[in-house]
Amino acid sequence: MKRKWGLVRIGILSFWGALLLSIALAAPSQAHWADLAVANVEVGNTTTHITLTFPTGLVATADDNRNGTLSPAEVRAHQTELTTFLGDRIYLTDGNGDRGTLTVAPSDTTVLPPDQQVTAGTHSTLKLSYTWLKPVQGLTLHYDLFLPGVPTARCLTTINAPGQTQSVIFSPESKEADLMQNAPWYFAGGIPLAIAGCFVWGAMHAMSPGHGKTIVGAYLVGAHATPQHAVFLGLTTTITHTAGVFALGLGTLFFSQYVLPERLYPWLSFISGLIVVDIGLRQLISRLRQNRVAAKAARSHQHDDHSHTHEPSEHTRDVAHVHAQAAPHTHTHAEQTHNHHDHSHDRHNHSHEHPQLHTHDHGDGHVHSHALPGSDGAPVTWRSLLALGISGGMVPCPSALVMLLSAIALGRVGFGLLMVLVFSLGLAGTLTALGLMLVSARHLFERLPTNVRLARLVPAVSALVITLLGVGISTQAVMQIGLFKPFGTFG
Amino acid sequence: MESSHGVGQATLKRLRKVPLLVLSIAGLLLTIPIGLKVWTEFDRAKLAAPYRYEFERPSPGSVTQKLEQEIAFYQDRIRRDPDGGMNRALLAKVYIKMARATGETSWYLLGEQTAQESLVKLPFSNDGALMALARVATAKHDFQEAIRLSQKATPNEDTLAVQVTTNLAIGKVKDADQAADRLVAQNPDLAALTLQALVAVSQGQEQKALQAFQQGLAAEEPEETGSSVWARTVLGRLYFKRGQLEMAEKLYQEVLRVLPQYPPAVLNLAELEVRRGNYRAAETLYNKIFLTSQRSPTVYDHIVFRGMARVKELQGDPKSANEWRDRAEARLRLDLVAFGHRRELARLLLERGRPQDLTEALSLMEQEVKVRRDAETMDTLAWVLSRMGRWQEAQTAMQEALRWGIRDAALFQRAGTIAQTLGNTAQAETFFKAAQATDPTFDEQAQKALGLGVGLLGLN
């Protein structure tokens, strides 16, 4: 039971952590003192008492003298309607779903002299007692006493059960919680719901800004990627992200006396940005070269000892190219340029097809992939995909880190790790789906006439975008680190 | 077949490269924290030794966790002794500590409810409950009520501390001074000495203030994290007000090293960034406050809204600035009665600069000065009056603001402007010189950050 409670606590904490950290730019709450309520719950065997201080405006009709505070006389005079009103909004059910019988009484504090009632005039305090005929197990508290039209109204509640004290905040979004002896709070549905929630959260979180979506998008569109590449990229991001959260979480714990985790983020961003710049630059250089070559080849030129046919229209996966002679020539594969001077194509014409993915060995141990040579001759390489995936997942989401640290703080390391993994899978699901969509969409572009000059420029432009994004990420990180301050500052 | 063999070999080759990559990343992840540790220590070395927090800083969340443990402890004792009042008073005190640690207003309400229950159970000699109510009243800016409640309790360190704070707020600086001296005589701890320093600042006795801060920090104990961060925050703001931005920044950073989410330090750091013209950095800091305050409303929300409005305006986005001001205004209006935010609302209306708001701003300030007359409040009144062209009355208000000798460049600047308008050129010149002497870097950019910080010149 304790274990279950611990797991559920992690779920609750994670939920809050996620909420806190994932909506950085969300509109802040607008609740104010007059909307706030507080309650103290004393859990007993057959009777549970709630001392509730709430905005009197919620029961304005019972405030006969309109002084903003319910007096004992007013409570007695409106006993029935108060009981009905409050019983509909705040009730406790036992494990069988039976509601406790509610009685409402004025609080003892009304006997205090007015000068000791600081909130008099805005709030009233009542004692609510819920009674069952026999001892109960598995209590659930339902709280729905909020001012209408105030979505951010809150009720801070402390719950005291034997040997256990907890505080919880009810809100219009969180009106219900299970209260059990020795296992006070958990949301209905328990662990499976927590895991499912984590997956959905991760998936939704991936839609928020960041996570290298733009870079990945630019890469997949610019390069001739396949669905497998998109999946590989998604998986790499997941694995790196999960590993990053684990490493950072453990690092944070280990170095918590010395380093604030938030100071690590800019450094990781910086490294991530550098990787992206590297990828972008390599692609850019490679594609510019190929554009040049393609432009020449388009004229169907003839060299002294061998000819290449590089009609732009043949720059598809079905392209057949002819090596008429064994002269040294260059293949450029996006990330690396290698010379074929160490292996030969002995005076043979070979015409090979390039299905979606294949590698071939030239017999010298030099395996190279002709994964989808594109019209620009810049195929997607696994190395670049790996680097891109790592750069995308390298900076762990603070939300995931909070989730892990909350779990560790509660001693539920295993469950925390599982939740981080599920979160990352959700994240990867979205990223992969986006990647697949982009890859599918790219085929639409392929159907366009490829001899259009603009179409040849697309890969180079995408590489340039990647490079600029990388520069942007790195610069922002450097500024966050504080190594560089913008001009115009003083002090 | 040959093709699948090739694929297998290729995959193997790629996999061989993976450990190297993983090792490099792991190495980086380990090297960065160590590097940062060195960096942090190097950075901290620039902070004068007495201002450094030399104890082990609390692990993340441990401050509130400890308070939660205290709450559980007293709740358990209340269960064992349901008719007792003493444990409820102590519990109320912990709730108020929680309110101060988190800034969440709900804890004040819970503290009040519990203190009242305590007084029902123990109507006499219940100083703890009375002082808990006095603390709630202070938080709500009901200073007269706070003084009255504290006077009903037997004089002790708690009552003296409340008296220092409340007397400062209502402009009775001499009474605050006496209370602070008695407090320090009774228990010269960091909290008491910080209060004494604040009283000294309000009288322009900076050396005495610095001495009190240093003495307090020298007497610092590891168990008083709240006082440790508060003292450094207000000391940082004192340096900020003197134009020593580097020192202020170091102190705020030291606070955030101890308590990474401490709202006053985050807000003051944002104020500092606005003054430096680093609006993006300020915005990031305000967003950091939102991250931690989504759970429940806090007493700092309106400052954050105003700060965001200022930043947006300075970034050339008047539409967003207005939206943030609307939020701040809505919040301040709703809390006007409960938390006495009349002064803040008046300042917001003045910042908006709409002529039609001036009458309301004046009305608010006329109400406010009935209960609060610290330097900042009187300065705000002078601001309203001068905007309305009532320069003579503005001068009277400024004179009251400066009567205890407080040294603040912004106040001197306003006093100078008022004197100049009234034709007292020599006096105006004296004020402008005093402003420059107080803060040699006080310029147009510095004025853009006015009123965004927390602490030092009275409660926000």
Predicted regions and their residues:
Chain B
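Canonical tetratricopeptide repeat
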Residues: L90, A132, V162, L195, ...
